Amino acid sequence: FWQMGGVGPMAGQVHHFRNYAVETLTYAINRYINEVNRLYGVMNLRLKDRPFIAGKYSIADMALVGWVNGWERQGQDINEFPNLKRWLETMKARPAVKRGMALGLELRQGIDMKDPKVQAVLFNQRARTG
């Protein structure tokens, strides 16, 4: 599934290197910003003549909306992708999407991703054996 092998991993990497990493790695930031931009272009073309990714509303739209909604934190300009922007606005207007995006919002607000205690939970953990 395209979201699982493309948009999710690439957007996740740009979020990591752009917003959470303890050191600035310009090459990594630019690489993933550009790859997400390319993937947004693919979605924009796909949405040129249809309201949803697969034509009708489907799990494909549900899986992608959370990632595309983070366009600003991914270093993207949604206005470069008018079909994708229309799709995102349509998705965000759906009652079920609104409810889903509201879940846990209070838990996500105010978290400092640069706080060493937060980063200790997120990074440099290894599997323990034995």
Regions found by a protein language model. Give the residues of each.
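GST-like fold's C-terminal all-alpha helical module
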Residues: 3-100, 129-130
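Acidic/histidine-enriched, glycine/proline-rich intrinsically disordered or flexible terminal extensions
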Residues: 105-130
